[in-house]
Amino acid sequence: MKKLFILAVLMLAVATTQAQKHHGVYAIGFYNLENLFDYTHDEGKKDEDFLPTGRYQWNQTKYEWKLRNLSRVLSEMGTEVLPKQGCAVIGVAEVENDHCMSDLVAQEPLKKRGYRYVHIEGPDHRGIDCALIYNPKLFKVDDAKLLPYIYDLPADSLRATRGFLAVTGTLAKDRVTVIV
């Protein structure tokens, strides 16, 4: 499913660049990090399950293992089409905080590609956010903001949840906004 999504995005990118007479192909990806939590408590967040004494007995060893595996997978995204480059941007979901993102891009596979990230702490009571990983050689960030999720029914809006991260920047001389 993820490969089909990347292929569809690549085909769209090629069609867009062809129509605008720009030449170049850029991979854009998305990955659900599936609860990338560190093992320390964030005040005001319901992250107790991901503490050493919590439900998952989350600890440094498990955290570092997950970081290594995620960084390998993320660094390989887009390389079937662009082996030396990989993805220009990768939207990610279910990350706890800025600390987790910093630790993730510091892993050797992502560090070698020079990836950076954009993360804005959201209102989700569980501490689950979205972020954007990007290659600064390919994508220049101009602006980032968190857009709230608007519920259809007022009764549903009593629960704070993660919003959408909107990052605007330049890719291949075109201004683009990526929403995660």
Model-assigned labels for residue ranges:
Residues M11, N35, K137:
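Short, glycine/serine-rich, charged loops/turns that create anion-binding
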Residues A27-N35, D143-K145, R175-V180:
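Active-site-proximal beta-strand elements of phosphoester/diester hydrolases
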Residues V95-R175:
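Structured beta-strand-rich core segments of catalytic domains in phosphoester-bond hydrolases
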Residues A19-E108, V118-I128:
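N-terminal, active-site-proximal structural segment of metallo-dependent hydrolase catalytic domains
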